[in-house]
């Protein structure tokens, strides 16, 4: 992913030791009733299931061994509730950002594939989401535009402090949604398509980014780390 450094307000200190890196942990929110019922869930405010604490307990334990320096979270309820379970100590420092919301499915919110499968507009959207917008919903360009804006801003923030120091690396944690994670991974990892990533509720995917010039190149790494 290319990052525009002009007028960014952050100078790249190329004379500092070590390459610029980012470790980003992308977390999908826990399970909601609509996830279980396989309904399209975009901007609708629905909370997690009553067993959220038990569902997210393994991720909470895994994150206890992670050194994080920034936490971002979608402002939707299911993500805020997820954050409370997995990183309660971060609540006072988290940056809530509406750009991290799931795609807005408009009139298709709350509907299932079986309810929509005979709709010709829906069929066209499935085949070419870049060209078709759900009625009353968000276009592909609007969805990806806000996510590109978030990525650009996140990668430019705090740059000098993120040089690798004696092999120690801190992590950025982002709590968000399945469609968001699919898109950002397709932007950050060369050759990865939108549908190539499968992420279930309550799962974390770690991406390591290395900067070459004004480009960031990502690779997926094992999470949790071996031995954690």
Mark where each language-model region is.
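Phosphate-handling substructures
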Residues: 86-146
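Short hydrophobic/aromatic-enriched beta-strand-loop microsegments
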Residues: 47, 90-98, 192-201
């Amino acid at each position: 992913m290319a990052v525009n450094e002009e007028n960014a307000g952050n100078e790249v200190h190329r004379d500092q030791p070590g390459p610029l890196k980012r470790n980003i942990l992308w977390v999908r929110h826990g399970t909601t009733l609509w996830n279980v019922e396989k309904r399209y869930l975009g901007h609708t405010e629905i909370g997690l299931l009553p067993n959220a604490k038990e569902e997210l307990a393994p991720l909470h334990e895994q994150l206890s061994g992670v050194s994080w320096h920034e936490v971002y979270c979608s402002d939707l309820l299911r993500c805020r509730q997820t954050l409370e379970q997995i990183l309660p100590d971060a609540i006072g420092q988290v940056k809530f950002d509406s750009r991290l919301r799931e795609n807005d499915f408009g009139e298709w919110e709350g509907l299932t594939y079986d309810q929509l499968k005979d709709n010709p507009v829906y069929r066209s959207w499935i085949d070419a989401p870049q060209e078709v917008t759900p009625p009353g919903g968000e276009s592909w360009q609007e969805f990806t535009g806000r996510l590109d804006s978030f990525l650009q801003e996140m990668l430019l923030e705090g740059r000098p402090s993120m040089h690798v120091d004696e092999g120690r690396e801190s992590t950025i944690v982002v709590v968000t949604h399945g469609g968001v994670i699919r898109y950002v991974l397709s932007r950050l990892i060369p050759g990865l398509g939108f549908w190539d990533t499968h992420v279930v509720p309550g799962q974390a995917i770690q991406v390591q980014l290395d900067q070459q010039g004004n480009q960031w190149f990502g690779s997926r790494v094992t999470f949790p780390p071996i031995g954690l």
